[in-house]
A protein has these predicted regions:
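Structured catalytic-domain cores with a bias toward divalent-metal coordination
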Residues: 1-266
Length: 266
C-alpha cells in the first residue's frame, strides 16, 4: 500500500478503509482468541449491541463494514496447516461472489457447500446483509509470507479498479481455478490414520499423482515409519500439514482433483 500511495495519489477516487487487525488484544497476546475469555471473535458475529463486551464489539464491526462496495477478510491459515492463496465462498453467495473473486489474483476459488459454512463468521454475516465479502486464506498461521502479500496487493488493486475506486495502472492478474465442493466433487482430504509425527514429502501447490507419496507418519520413540500417506487422487496439493504432531483423524492435506485443474471455468 505504501508503494502505491506514494507514487499514485491521483489514482484514488473513493475511500478505502484498512483494518490491520479486528482483534488487537489477540495480536498483543499472540493468540487467535480474545484474551481472558479464550473466545474466537470470528464465531460471535453478527454480535449483539446489548450483549457483553465481545458481542458489542462484533456488532459495532458489522455496523462499520455494512454497506461497503466490497469487504476483503484476509486470514492466514491456522498454525497446523499451510495454504496456497485462495478465496473461500459459501455456495449460497457463489453467483454474486465468484465473478468478483476471479479479479482478486488468487490461485484458487473454493466454493463450499452451505452445510459446512459457519453462520457466526464475519463474512457470512456481511454477505447475509447484502455486503459482498470475500474470505482470503493463505500461508500458515502466526506468520507473514511476503510473496503472498504482494500477490494479494495486486489483487486488491485489480478489484479496486473493477469497482472504480482505483483509476491508476492495474497489474495483470492470474486466472484462478474455481473448485466446487458442495458435494465433494472437486476436493478430497487426507486424514491421519494414526497418531505420530508427520513428515511431509510434498510442498503445498505441488502436483501429485494418485497413490503418490505425500508424507509419512513416524513413531517418535522408535523412528519407525508407521504409515505412508498417499494422494487419494491425482491433482494439486493445495493444503499441507505444517505442524508435525498428528492424532488419529488430524487433517494433513487437501487435494484439488485433476478435473478441476483442467476446467478452470465457472
Amino acid at each position: 500500500m505504501k508503494l502505491y500511495t506514494e507514487c499514485h495519489w491521483d489514482g484514488w477516487d473513493r475511500i478505502v478503509d484498512i483494518y490491520p487487525a479486528m482483534n488487537p488484544f489477540g495480536i498483543d497476546s499472540i493468540t487467535r482468541g480474545i484474551p481472558a475469555f479464550d473466545l474466537d471473535m470470528n464465531r460471535i458475529f453478527p454480535g449483539n449491541m446489548d450483549g457483553d463486551m465481545n458481542e458489542y464489539m462484533a456488532s459495532k464491526i458489522v455496523g462499520e463494514l455494512q454497506g461497503a462496495d466490497l469487504v476483503i477478510d484476509i486470514h492466514a491459515s491456522n498454525i497446523f496447516l499451510t495454504e496456497i492463496p485462495q478465496i473461500r465462498i459459501n455456495e449460497l453467495h457463489a453467483k454474486e461472489l465468484v465473478p468478483i473473486a476471479q479479479k482478486a489474483n488468487m490461485d484458487l476459488i473454493w466454493v463450499h457447500g452451505a452445510s459446512t459454512v459457519l453462520e457466526s463468521t464475519l463474512a457470512y454475516s456481511l454477505n447475509s446483509k447484502g455486503t459482498n465479502t470475500l474470505v482470503v486464506e493463505m500461508g500458515v498461521g502466526m506468520r507473514i509470507t511476503p510473496e503472498y502479500g504482494r500477490q494479494m496487493t495486486d489483487g486488491i488493486f485489480s478489484l479496486m479498479s473493477e469497482f472504480g475506486i482505483w483509476t491508476g495502472d492495474t497489474p495483470s492478474v492470474r486466472e484462478s481455478i474455481v473448485a466446487y465442493d458442495a458435494d465433494g466433487d472437486d476436493v478430497c482430504y487426507l486424514n491421519a490414520p494414526c497418531s505420530g509425527i508427520y513428515m511431509k514429502e510434498k510442498e503445498h501447490g505441488s502436483l501429485v499423482k494418485k497413490d503418490e507419496l505425500v508424507g509419512r507418519i513416524i513413531n517418535p520413540l522408535s523412528g519407525e515409519v508407521i504409515a505412508d500417506i498417499k494422494a487419494p487422487e491425482s491433482g494439486m496439493l493445495f493444503t499441507v500439514r505444517e505442524y508435525p504432531v498428528v492424532e488419529d483423524g488430524s487433517l494433513m492435506g487437501r487435494v484439488l482433483k485433476e478435473k478441476a485443474l483442467t476446467e478452470k471455468v465457472v
